[in-house]
Protein backbone atom coordinates (compact mmCIF):
# COMPACT_ATOMS: atom_id res chain seq x y z
CA UNK A 1 0.00 0.00 0.00
CA UNK A 2 1.31 3.48 -0.88
CA UNK A 3 1.88 5.81 2.06
CA UNK A 4 -0.83 8.41 2.57
CA UNK A 5 -3.39 6.54 0.46
CA UNK A 6 -6.37 4.86 2.02
CA UNK A 7 -7.38 1.60 0.38
CA UNK A 8 -11.16 1.28 0.30
CA UNK A 9 -12.37 -2.27 0.84
CA UNK A 10 -15.00 -3.54 -1.57
CA UNK A 11 -18.48 -3.83 -0.03
CA UNK A 12 -19.58 -7.36 0.63
CA UNK A 13 -22.22 -8.90 -1.60
CA UNK A 14 -25.52 -10.08 -0.16
CA UNK A 15 -24.45 -13.67 -0.85
CA UNK A 16 -21.24 -13.20 1.15
CA UNK A 17 -23.13 -11.73 4.08
CA UNK A 18 -25.62 -14.60 3.90
CA UNK A 19 -22.83 -17.22 3.95
CA UNK A 20 -21.06 -15.51 6.84
CA UNK A 21 -24.30 -15.47 8.81
CA UNK A 22 -24.89 -19.18 8.15
CA UNK A 23 -21.30 -20.05 9.09
CA UNK A 24 -21.60 -18.10 12.35
CA UNK A 25 -24.86 -19.87 13.17
CA UNK A 26 -23.32 -23.23 12.22
CA UNK A 27 -20.33 -22.69 14.50
CA UNK A 28 -22.66 -21.84 17.35
CA UNK A 29 -24.80 -24.94 16.73
CA UNK A 30 -21.73 -27.22 16.63
CA UNK A 31 -20.34 -25.61 19.78
CA UNK A 32 -23.62 -26.19 21.62
CA UNK A 33 -24.08 -29.76 20.33
CA UNK A 34 -24.55 -32.25 23.19
CA UNK A 35 -22.27 -34.90 21.64
CA UNK A 36 -19.56 -35.10 19.01
CA UNK A 37 -21.85 -37.33 16.96
CA UNK A 38 -24.56 -34.67 17.05
CA UNK A 39 -22.01 -32.03 15.99
CA UNK A 40 -20.89 -34.19 13.07
CA UNK A 41 -24.51 -34.72 12.05
CA UNK A 42 -25.08 -30.96 11.99
CA UNK A 43 -21.93 -30.41 9.90
CA UNK A 44 -22.86 -33.17 7.43
CA UNK A 45 -26.34 -31.71 7.06
CA UNK A 46 -24.86 -28.31 6.24
CA UNK A 47 -22.32 -29.71 3.74
CA UNK A 48 -25.02 -31.61 1.86
CA UNK A 49 -27.32 -28.60 1.65
CA UNK A 50 -27.76 -26.64 -1.59
CA UNK A 51 -26.71 -23.26 -0.21
CA UNK A 52 -27.38 -21.40 -3.45
CA UNK A 53 -30.93 -22.72 -3.57
CA UNK A 54 -31.46 -21.81 0.08
CA UNK A 55 -30.15 -18.30 -0.62
CA UNK A 56 -32.44 -17.84 -3.64
CA UNK A 57 -35.44 -19.04 -1.62
CA UNK A 58 -34.46 -16.68 1.19
CA UNK A 59 -34.11 -13.77 -1.24
CA UNK A 60 -37.46 -14.54 -2.83
CA UNK A 61 -39.17 -14.72 0.56
CA UNK A 62 -37.62 -11.45 1.75
CA UNK A 63 -38.60 -9.72 -1.50
CA UNK A 64 -42.21 -10.92 -1.27
CA UNK A 65 -42.49 -9.99 2.40
CA UNK A 66 -40.97 -6.56 1.81
CA UNK A 67 -43.29 -5.87 -1.12
CA UNK A 68 -46.26 -7.05 0.92
CA UNK A 69 -45.28 -4.78 3.81
CA UNK A 70 -44.84 -1.77 1.52
CA UNK A 71 -48.15 -2.47 -0.21
CA UNK A 72 -49.93 -2.74 3.13
CA UNK A 73 -48.44 0.41 4.65
CA UNK A 74 -47.91 2.67 1.60
CA UNK A 75 -51.16 4.63 1.98
CA UNK A 76 -50.44 5.30 5.63
CA UNK A 77 -46.87 6.37 4.83
CA UNK A 78 -47.95 8.59 1.94
CA UNK A 79 -50.64 10.26 4.08
CA UNK A 80 -48.00 10.97 6.72
CA UNK A 81 -45.69 12.33 4.01
CA UNK A 82 -48.47 14.56 2.67
CA UNK A 83 -49.28 15.84 6.14
CA UNK A 84 -45.64 16.86 6.60
CA UNK A 85 -45.75 18.42 3.12
CA UNK A 86 -48.81 20.52 3.95
CA UNK A 87 -47.22 21.60 7.23
CA UNK A 88 -44.12 22.78 5.35
CA UNK A 89 -46.19 24.61 2.71
CA UNK A 90 -48.15 26.41 5.43
CA UNK A 91 -44.92 27.53 7.15
CA UNK A 92 -43.45 28.59 3.80
CA UNK A 93 -46.52 30.65 2.97
CA UNK A 94 -46.52 32.23 6.43
CA UNK A 95 -42.87 33.21 6.15
CA UNK A 96 -42.72 34.34 2.52
CA UNK A 97 -46.30 35.36 1.70
CA UNK A 98 -45.39 38.98 0.92
CA UNK A 99 -42.77 37.87 -1.59
CA UNK A 100 -45.14 35.33 -3.16
CA UNK A 101 -47.92 37.92 -3.44
CA UNK A 102 -45.52 40.38 -5.10
CA UNK A 103 -44.36 37.73 -7.60
CA UNK A 104 -47.89 36.56 -8.41
CA UNK A 105 -49.11 40.15 -8.74
CA UNK A 106 -46.29 40.80 -11.21
CA UNK A 107 -47.33 37.70 -13.17
CA UNK A 108 -51.01 38.72 -13.26
CA UNK A 109 -50.32 42.33 -14.29
CA UNK A 110 -47.75 41.34 -16.92
CA UNK A 111 -50.13 38.78 -18.41
CA UNK A 112 -52.95 41.33 -18.57
CA UNK A 113 -50.66 43.88 -20.23
CA UNK A 114 -49.38 41.30 -22.73
CA UNK A 115 -52.92 40.27 -23.69
CA UNK A 116 -53.97 43.91 -24.15
CA UNK A 117 -50.87 44.65 -26.22
CA UNK A 118 -51.47 41.61 -28.45
CA UNK A 119 -55.05 42.70 -29.12
CA UNK A 120 -53.83 46.19 -30.01
CA UNK A 121 -51.09 44.96 -32.38
CA UNK A 122 -53.41 42.52 -34.13
CA UNK A 123 -56.00 45.27 -34.64
CA UNK A 124 -53.55 47.41 -36.61
CA UNK A 125 -53.85 47.69 -40.41
CA UNK A 126 -51.85 44.99 -42.19
CA UNK A 127 -49.48 47.42 -43.90
CA UNK A 128 -48.62 48.99 -40.54
CA UNK A 129 -48.19 45.64 -38.80
CA UNK A 130 -46.35 43.75 -41.57
CA UNK A 131 -42.86 45.38 -41.29
CA UNK A 132 -42.46 44.02 -37.75
CA UNK A 133 -44.46 40.82 -38.16
CA UNK A 134 -41.66 38.30 -37.45
CA UNK A 135 -40.30 40.33 -34.57
CA UNK A 136 -43.77 40.38 -33.04
CA UNK A 137 -44.25 36.62 -33.50
CA UNK A 138 -40.84 35.77 -32.03
CA UNK A 139 -41.26 38.08 -29.06
CA UNK A 140 -44.81 36.93 -28.39
CA UNK A 141 -43.72 33.29 -28.12
CA UNK A 142 -40.59 34.11 -26.13
CA UNK A 143 -42.66 36.21 -23.75
CA UNK A 144 -45.24 33.45 -23.37
CA UNK A 145 -42.53 30.95 -22.54
CA UNK A 146 -40.97 33.36 -20.04
CA UNK A 147 -44.34 33.87 -18.36
CA UNK A 148 -44.79 30.14 -17.91
CA UNK A 149 -41.26 29.73 -16.55
CA UNK A 150 -41.82 32.62 -14.14
CA UNK A 151 -44.91 30.84 -12.79
CA UNK A 152 -42.93 27.59 -12.54
CA UNK A 153 -40.32 29.44 -10.46
CA UNK A 154 -43.01 30.77 -8.11
CA UNK A 155 -44.39 27.25 -7.71
CA UNK A 156 -40.93 25.81 -7.00
CA UNK A 157 -40.20 28.55 -4.45
CA UNK A 158 -43.51 27.92 -2.69
CA UNK A 159 -42.58 24.25 -2.49
CA UNK A 160 -39.10 24.95 -1.14
CA UNK A 161 -37.06 23.92 -4.17
CA UNK A 162 -34.49 26.71 -4.42
CA UNK A 163 -32.15 24.89 -6.80
CA UNK A 164 -35.00 23.94 -9.13
CA UNK A 165 -36.23 27.54 -9.16
CA UNK A 166 -32.74 28.82 -9.93
CA UNK A 167 -32.37 26.27 -12.72
CA UNK A 168 -35.56 27.62 -14.32
CA UNK A 169 -34.25 31.18 -13.98
CA UNK A 170 -31.27 30.07 -16.08
CA UNK A 171 -33.69 29.45 -18.95
CA UNK A 172 -35.39 32.81 -18.34
CA UNK A 173 -32.02 34.57 -18.51
CA UNK A 174 -31.27 32.89 -21.83
CA UNK A 175 -34.66 34.04 -23.13
CA UNK A 176 -33.91 37.60 -22.03
CA UNK A 177 -30.62 37.53 -23.97
CA UNK A 178 -32.25 36.06 -27.09
CA UNK A 179 -35.15 38.53 -27.00
CA UNK A 180 -32.73 41.44 -26.59
CA UNK A 181 -30.65 40.18 -29.52
CA UNK A 182 -33.67 39.79 -31.81
CA UNK A 183 -35.05 43.26 -31.01
CA UNK A 184 -31.60 44.78 -31.46
CA UNK A 185 -30.87 43.20 -34.87
CA UNK A 186 -34.31 43.30 -36.40
CA UNK A 187 -36.86 41.60 -38.59
CA UNK A 188 -34.61 39.33 -40.66
CA UNK A 189 -33.05 37.86 -37.52
CA UNK A 190 -36.51 37.32 -36.03
CA UNK A 191 -37.62 35.49 -39.18
CA UNK A 192 -34.53 33.25 -39.14
CA UNK A 193 -35.20 32.51 -35.46
CA UNK A 194 -38.73 31.39 -36.28
CA UNK A 195 -37.66 29.31 -39.29
CA UNK A 196 -35.01 27.55 -37.17
CA UNK A 197 -37.81 26.09 -35.02
CA UNK A 198 -38.36 23.43 -37.69
CA UNK A 199 -34.67 22.44 -37.79
CA UNK A 200 -31.90 21.18 -35.50
CA UNK A 201 -30.27 24.61 -35.61
CA UNK A 202 -29.66 26.11 -32.15
CA UNK A 203 -27.92 29.42 -32.80
CA UNK A 204 -26.87 29.52 -36.48
CA UNK A 205 -29.93 31.67 -37.19
CA UNK A 206 -28.07 34.48 -35.38
CA UNK A 207 -25.64 34.82 -38.32
CA UNK A 208 -28.33 36.87 -40.04
CA UNK A 209 -27.33 39.75 -37.76
CA UNK A 210 -23.93 39.99 -39.53
CA UNK A 211 -22.34 40.33 -36.09
CA UNK A 212 -20.14 37.24 -36.39
CA UNK A 213 -17.19 36.41 -38.59
CA UNK A 214 -17.91 34.09 -41.51
CA UNK A 215 -14.84 32.13 -40.42
CA UNK A 216 -16.52 31.27 -37.13
CA UNK A 217 -17.51 27.61 -37.37
CA UNK A 218 -20.31 27.60 -34.79
CA UNK A 219 -22.33 30.30 -33.06
CA UNK A 220 -22.82 29.74 -29.33
CA UNK A 221 -25.08 31.32 -26.74
CA UNK A 222 -22.02 33.01 -25.28
CA UNK A 223 -21.36 34.66 -28.66
CA UNK A 224 -24.88 36.08 -28.71
CA UNK A 225 -24.58 37.12 -25.09
CA UNK A 226 -21.53 39.24 -25.87
CA UNK A 227 -23.22 41.32 -28.58
CA UNK A 228 -26.74 41.80 -27.20
CA UNK A 229 -27.82 44.95 -25.35
CA UNK A 230 -28.17 43.23 -21.96
CA UNK A 231 -25.19 43.80 -19.66
CA UNK A 232 -24.03 40.19 -19.70
CA UNK A 233 -20.90 40.97 -17.67
CA UNK A 234 -23.08 41.86 -14.69
CA UNK A 235 -24.98 38.58 -14.99
CA UNK A 236 -22.18 36.23 -16.02
CA UNK A 237 -21.32 35.06 -12.50
CA UNK A 238 -24.96 34.33 -11.70
CA UNK A 239 -25.49 32.55 -15.01
CA UNK A 240 -22.37 30.42 -14.45
CA UNK A 241 -23.67 29.50 -10.98
CA UNK A 242 -27.03 28.53 -12.50
CA UNK A 243 -25.23 26.32 -15.03
CA UNK A 244 -23.42 24.55 -12.20
CA UNK A 245 -26.74 24.11 -10.41
CA UNK A 246 -28.32 22.52 -13.49
CA UNK A 247 -25.45 20.22 -14.46
CA UNK A 248 -23.72 17.43 -12.52
CA UNK A 249 -20.90 19.70 -11.39
CA UNK A 250 -19.08 19.35 -8.04
CA UNK A 251 -20.05 22.93 -7.20
CA UNK A 252 -23.72 22.27 -7.88
CA UNK A 253 -23.57 18.99 -5.97
CA UNK A 254 -21.82 20.16 -2.80
CA UNK A 255 -23.08 23.75 -2.85
CA UNK A 256 -26.85 23.43 -3.02
CA UNK A 257 -28.79 26.67 -2.59
CA UNK A 258 -31.15 25.07 -0.09
CA UNK A 259 -28.55 23.51 2.22
CA UNK A 260 -28.05 26.58 4.47
CA UNK A 261 -24.46 27.04 3.31
CA UNK A 262 -23.17 23.99 5.14
CA UNK A 263 -21.94 20.59 3.99
CA UNK A 264 -23.44 19.12 7.17
CA UNK A 265 -26.83 19.03 5.43
CA UNK A 266 -27.68 17.09 2.26
CA UNK A 267 -30.84 18.44 0.64
CA UNK A 268 -33.15 15.58 -0.32
CA UNK A 269 -36.43 17.50 -0.35
CA UNK A 270 -37.95 20.85 0.55
CA UNK A 271 -36.09 23.68 2.27
CA UNK A 272 -37.13 27.22 3.21
CA UNK A 273 -33.58 28.41 2.56
CA UNK A 274 -32.13 29.97 -0.59
CA UNK A 275 -35.26 30.90 -2.56
CA UNK A 276 -34.74 34.67 -2.66
CA UNK A 277 -32.08 34.62 -5.40
CA UNK A 278 -34.34 32.90 -7.93
CA UNK A 279 -37.25 35.17 -6.97
CA UNK A 280 -35.27 38.37 -7.50
CA UNK A 281 -33.49 37.28 -10.67
CA UNK A 282 -36.64 35.94 -12.34
CA UNK A 283 -38.52 39.19 -11.69
CA UNK A 284 -35.69 41.17 -13.34
CA UNK A 285 -35.56 38.80 -16.32
CA UNK A 286 -39.33 38.98 -16.84
CA UNK A 287 -39.17 42.78 -16.74
CA UNK A 288 -36.37 42.75 -19.34
CA UNK A 289 -38.28 40.43 -21.68
CA UNK A 290 -41.52 42.40 -21.25
CA UNK A 291 -39.89 45.77 -21.94
Which residues are covered by each model-predicted region?
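Charged, amphipathic alpha-helical oligomerization/scaffolding segments
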Residues: 98, 102-112, 116, 145, ...
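Short non-catalytic regulatory patches outside canonical folded cores
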Residues: 2, 8-9, 123-140, 148-162, ...
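Amphipathic, Lys/Arg-enriched alpha-helical patches that create a basic surface
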Residues: 263-291
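Extreme N-terminal leader/anchor segments
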Residues: 1-98
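N-terminal, Lys/Arg-enriched amphipathic/low-complexity engagement segments
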Residues: 76-140
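Carbohydrate-binding/catalytic loop surfaces
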Residues: 194-203, 258-270
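A structured, mid-to-C-terminal "fold-capping" secondary-structure block
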Residues: 235-266
